[in-house]
């Protein structure tokens, strides 16, 4: 969990309600975007990465036939079973994407899922907000930069 949220509920209860044997990773869906092209544009507008990196990743995904509408995670809340092989492999592949291509995690995570045919569980925003409260810290940071 990053600094976008404050904990307001019982985390033991939260985990008991979401964890299943079927899934090893849990994320929120991105609240505003579900296409990689939209995320590329946003990263470019906010200058969160260099144009060179953005174009390089775009071209790579295009060559691999990565579908534009493959969903996007909202990386502020990640719940994972750390000793699950599927989770470990996914995280290692994701790290390699970030290390070698773009440091923007939301550009690469859904690509890794697609590339390896892996599944995650998307958590309902309404459900999560029983346990976490957004604090808009990222919005405040952007205003003052």
Where are these regions (language model features)?
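Glycosyltransferase catalytic domains, chiefly GT-A lineage
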Residues: 1-145
């Amino acid at each position: 969990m990053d600094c976008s949220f404050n904990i307001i509920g019982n985390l033991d209860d939260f985990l008991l309600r979401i964890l299943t044997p079927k899934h090893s990773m849990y994320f929120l869906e991105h609240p505003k975007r579900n296409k990689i092209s939209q995320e590329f544009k946003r990263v470019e507008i906010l200058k969160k990465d260099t144009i060179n990196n953005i174009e390089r990743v775009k071209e790579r995904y295009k060559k691999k036939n990565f579908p534009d509408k493959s969903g996007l995670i909202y990386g502020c809340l990640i719940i994972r079973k750390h000793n699950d092989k599927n989770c470990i492999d996914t995280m290692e592949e994701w790290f390699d994407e970030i290390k070698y291509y773009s440091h923007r995690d939301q550009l690469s995570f859904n690509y890794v899922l697609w590339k390896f045919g892996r599944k995650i569980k998307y958590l309902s925003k309404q459900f999560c907000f029983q346990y976490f409260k957004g604090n808009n810290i990222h919005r405040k940071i952007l205003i003052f930069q």
